[in-house]
């Protein structure tokens, strides 16, 4: 174990490697940073903040999602209230109509939100549903000034190209957890299927968004593995969700990891993925409460605002006021795609 002075020196060397030499850290270096964080968490959190400030200044990207289809999912992901394998009380919702989506979108665009994503339950949409969702995206793309993302399950090359054609710029599919822990979370599909979908999206010209959920019983080593696996895929943005244990799911009795461990996790993701958008997503209000502000000092430069798929988030206006109090500037769709 390094002493304090050795820890300070190691952190300085990592900072120089990333910022001055534009090099990625190795897995063993991330493990050493975690060991340092156990005793001197501020060293690692401050490093993450320095890296974030170097690449993103004091800007933050906001996105909002709309649950365009909810429930009746045949997959058995242990965290999810939408699975038919679990006994959760949620409102089942068929594919949304255009006017429903537009009503929410027009509320969203009254705020400085950069991205808007339609999310559907299930392995994938059937052909009829997919054509309807294409029509919705086409209408939004032609009439509204917001970047469009999609989270519609597994993809084919043909579908990826169609999404790109109607104005979608980014495709989302979470790895959820590390490759070695995934078997503990889901048995009805493989993580490799998710990876293939991300590769298909990328090959078609879409940006890719993929992250995971922390506090599902995994340890920090598994989280670090996930960060490196996402780096290997060269994802563009990384949503980090914190488990919100939902009654009726197999994970309903899990105790959420403590706040400091969450902050260290976020910091390590920033250090491993220095140039990517690290987005604080679902579960943040439940897990962090008033301490959510501290997450944005640990390398986070993105925030999902509004409600989630089946759980409520903080009101958009309230969230934006909180972020403004931190002197953060909101990215627009002029800040790259």
From Swiss-Prot:
It holds the Pfam family BATS. Binds 1 [4Fe-4S] cluster. The cluster is coordinated with 3 cysteines and an exchangeable S-adenosyl-L-methionine. Its EC number is 2.8.1.6. Keywords: 2Fe-2S, 4Fe-4S, Biotin biosynthesis, Iron, Iron-sulfur, Metal-binding, S-adenosyl-L-methionine, Transferase. Pathway: Cofactor biosynthesis; biotin biosynthesis; biotin from 7,8-diaminononanoate: step 2/2. It catalyses: (4R,5S)-dethiobiotin + (sulfur carrier)-SH + 2 reduced [2Fe-2S]-[ferredoxin] + 2 S-adenosyl-L-methionine = (sulfur carrier)-H + biotin + 2 5'-deoxyadenosine + 2 L-methionine + 2 oxidized [2Fe-2S]-[ferredoxin]. InterPro entries: Aldolase_TIM (IPR013785), BATS_dom (IPR010722), Biotin_synth/BioAB (IPR002684), Biotin_synthase (IPR024177), Elp3/MiaA/NifB-like_rSAM (IPR006638), rSAM (IPR007197). Its cofactor is [4Fe-4S] cluster; [2Fe-2S] cluster. Residues 55-284 form the Radical SAM core domain. GO terms for molecular function: 2 iron, 2 sulfur cluster binding; 4 iron, 4 sulfur cluster binding; biotin synthase activity; iron ion binding. Belongs to the radical SAM superfamily. Biotin synthase family. PANTHER family: BIOTIN SYNTHASE, BIOTIN SYNTHASE, MITOCHONDRIAL. This is Biotin synthase. It comes from Caldicellulosiruptor bescii (strain ATCC BAA-1888 / DSM 6725 / KCTC 15123 / Z-1320).
């Amino acid at each position: 174990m390094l002493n304090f002075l050795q820890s300070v020196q190691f952190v300085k060397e990592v900072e120089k490697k990333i910022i001055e030499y534009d090099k990625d850290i190795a897995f063993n270096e991330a493990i050493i940073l975690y060991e340092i964080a156990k005793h001197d968490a501020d060293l690692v959190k401050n490093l993450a903040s320095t890296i974030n400030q170097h690449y993103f200044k004091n800007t933050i990207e906001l996105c909002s999602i709309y649950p365009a289809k909810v429930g009746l999912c045949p997959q058995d992901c242990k965290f999810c209230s939408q699975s038919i394998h679990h006994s959760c009380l949620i409102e089942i919702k068929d594919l949304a109509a255009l006017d429903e989506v537009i009503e929410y979108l027009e509320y969203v665009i009254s705020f400085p939100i950069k991205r808007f994503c339609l999310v559907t339950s299930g392995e994938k949409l059937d052909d009829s549903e997919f054509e309807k969702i294409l029509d919705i995206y086409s209408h939004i793309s032609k009439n509204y000034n917001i970047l469009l993302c999609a989270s519609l399950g597994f993809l084919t090359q043909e579908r990826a190209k169609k999404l790109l054609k109607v104005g979608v710029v980014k495709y989302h599919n979470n790895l959820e957890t590390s490759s070695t822990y995934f078997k503990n979370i889901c048995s009805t599909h493989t993580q490799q299927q998710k990876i293939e979908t991300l590769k298909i999206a990328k090959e078609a010209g879409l940006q890719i968004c993929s992250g995971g959920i922390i506090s599902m019983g995994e340890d920090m080593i598994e989280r670090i593995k996930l960060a490196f696996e996402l780096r290997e895929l060269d994802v563009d943005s990384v949503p980090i969700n914190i488990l919100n244990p939902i009654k009726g799911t197999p994970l309903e009795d899990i105790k959420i990891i403590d706040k400091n461990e969450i902050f260290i996790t976020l910091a390590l993701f920033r250090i491993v993925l220095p140039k990517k958008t690290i987005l604080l997503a679902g579960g943040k209000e439940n897990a962090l409460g008033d301490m959510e502000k501290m997450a944005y000092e640990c390398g986070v430069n993105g925030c999902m605002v509004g409600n989630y798929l089946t759980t409520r988030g903080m009101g958009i206006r309230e969230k934006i006021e909180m972020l403004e109090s931190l002197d953060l500037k909101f990215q627009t769709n002029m800040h790259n795609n």
